[in-house]
């Protein structure tokens, strides 16, 4: 073994915890992918015009396109306490449901303004569910930047749904976390070929096929930012299958192997099902290794995808992890990925932006993964950057996306090489 070969395992490594200035989206942005996933749902943000502009810009749609989300704007009289916000909300919901009879699930989404005003959206959801049952179920959750960052909006949304799921004694598997439809289909196909089932998804594409949960339910996370949802499912009696997350060939194989072992799938069958897609994934990743191998990596906290992605880049792409920061580090959920990270990786939970920027300058990494607000200033200083938001909005899970995932990181390095007059 080469002396340069890294050792692996960060399970017991020290974690720097920072609670300073942050540069990250609020949880409202998760509506952008959730409204596309849940085809009979509508997300009504109770917030300000700033919330409305954020969602419209993030989703890349105009409001006249009739997307499945909107904002109940808190006006000046609401902020001044001169209007009954709950009556106004009831009126807006009634108008919405009359105009959109296809809605079966309505989510009241809390924002910074509604949190400051202490609007009781839980009580409002309960009241509105009673008014509009059985046609529509109304939920509430928070996407406020005071409470959530970026992907945590999905976590609070799914956690709000779990208590309302039907109870079952059936031995079913739930795959938890929103995936693009094409990726979900690939996931279900692999599990079906392994003989695992029945398999349900949370969130489901429609409310009439949402999962039930009970003491014989097993679940596995497809997304790493679902700590609150995990707790809600476990309180309903479901048991979590622990696994690395399905990024890259190795991560996908270990994820599927954890499910296969839980369901008693033979090694021969597992090999027969996974051999061909594993080979395709390895070949697709290999096309990017010349660009990625040996390059240093620094990740600012953004989406909670950082640790499993760093594992993928270190082990499958040969990158050198320096500092890997994440908004929140749920050690129980991340344990399988932490065990596979290079042991010399510096782990950070949370953010103190100025201090982290100073460390970044001292390290001077080859590739920096960061939010939109940091990317342009860092590019101007000569750093190659990858927008972290692309890793959430691009299909990156499972075998068939492994090459695309590697390409997301190799492209900025090739671009920087071209700008510097080198070979691409």
Curated annotation (Swiss-Prot):
One annotated GO biological process: light-independent bacteriochlorophyll biosynthetic process
Annotated effect of mutating residue 25 to A: Retains 50% activity
Keyword Iron: yes
EC number(s) from the headed UniProt entry: 1.3.7.7
UniProt KW ATP-binding keyword: yes
Molecular-function GO term, any one: oxidoreductase activity, acting on the CH-CH group of donors, iron-sulfur protein as acceptor
Coiled-coil portions: none
Pfam families assigned: Oxidored_nitro
Reactions the enzyme catalyzes: chlorophyllide a + oxidized 2[4Fe-4S]-[ferredoxin] + 2 ADP + 2 phosphate = protochlorophyllide a + reduced 2[4Fe-4S]-[ferredoxin] + 2 ATP + 2 H2O
Cofactor: [4Fe-4S] cluster
Pathway in which the depicted protein is active: Porphyrin-containing compound metabolism; bacteriochlorophyll biosynthesis (light-independent)
Database matches in Gene3D superfamilies: Nitrogenase molybdenum iron protein domain (3.40.50.1980)
Subunit structure: Protochlorophyllide reductase is composed of three subunits; BchL, BchN and BchB. Forms a heterotetramer of two BchB and two BchN subunits.
Name of protein: Light-independent protochlorophyllide reductase subunit N
The organism of origin for this protein: Rhodobacter capsulatus (strain ATCC BAA-309 / NBRC 16581 / SB1003)
Gene: bchN
């Amino acid at each position: 073994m080469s002396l340069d070969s890294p050792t692996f395992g960060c399970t017991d490594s020290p974690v720097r915890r920072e609670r300073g200035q942050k540069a990250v989206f609020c949880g409202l942005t998760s509506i952008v992918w959730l409204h596309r996933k849940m085809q009979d749902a509508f997300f009504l943000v109770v917030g300000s015009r700033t919330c409305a502009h954020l969602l419209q810009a993030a989703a890349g749609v105009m409001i006249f396109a009739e997307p499945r989300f909107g904002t109940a704007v808190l006006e000046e009289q609401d902020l001044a306490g001169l209007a009954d916000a709950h009556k106004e909300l009831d009126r807006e919901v009634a108008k919405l449901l009359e105009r959109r009879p296809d809605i079966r699930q309505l989510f009241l989404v809390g924002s910074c303004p509604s949190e400051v005003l202490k609007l009781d959206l839980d009580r409002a959801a309960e009241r509105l569910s009673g008014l509009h049952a059985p046609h529509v179920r109304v939920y509430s959750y928070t996407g406020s930047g005071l409470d959530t960052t970026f992907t945590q909006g999905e976590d609070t949304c799914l956690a709000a749904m779990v208590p309302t799921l039907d109870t079952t004694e059936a031995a079913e598997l739930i795959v938890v976390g929103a995936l693009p439809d094409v990726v979900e289909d690939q996931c279900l196909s692999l599990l079906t070929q392994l003989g695992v089932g029945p398999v349900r998804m949370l969130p489901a594409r429609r409310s009439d096929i949402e999962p039930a949960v009970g003491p014989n339910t097993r679940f596995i996370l497809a997304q790493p930012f679902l700590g609150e949802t995990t707790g809600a499912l476990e309180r309903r009696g479901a048991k979590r299958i622990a696994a690395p997350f399905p990024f890259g060939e190795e991560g996908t194989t270990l994820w599927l192997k954890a499910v296969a072992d839980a369901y008693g799938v033979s090694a021969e069958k597992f090999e027969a099902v996974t051999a061909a897609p594993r080979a395709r994934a390895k070949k697709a990743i290999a096309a990017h290794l010349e660009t990625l191998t040996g390059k240093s990596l620094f990740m600012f906290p953004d989406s909670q995808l950082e640790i499993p992605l760093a594992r993928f880049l270190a082990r499958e792409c040969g990158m050198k992890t320096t500092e890997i920061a994440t908004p929140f580090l749920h050690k129980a959920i991340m344990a399988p990925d932490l065990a596979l990270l290079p042991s010399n990786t510096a782990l950070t939970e949370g953010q103190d932006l100025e201090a982290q920027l100073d460390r970044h300058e001292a390290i001077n990494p080859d590739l920096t993964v960061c939010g939109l607000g940091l990317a342009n200033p860092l590019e101007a200083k000569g750093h190659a950057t990858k927008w972290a938001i692309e890793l959430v909005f691009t299909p990156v899970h499972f075998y068939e996306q492994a090459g695309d995932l590697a390409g997301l990181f190799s492209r900025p390095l090739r671009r920087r090489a071209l700008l510097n007059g080198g070979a691409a």
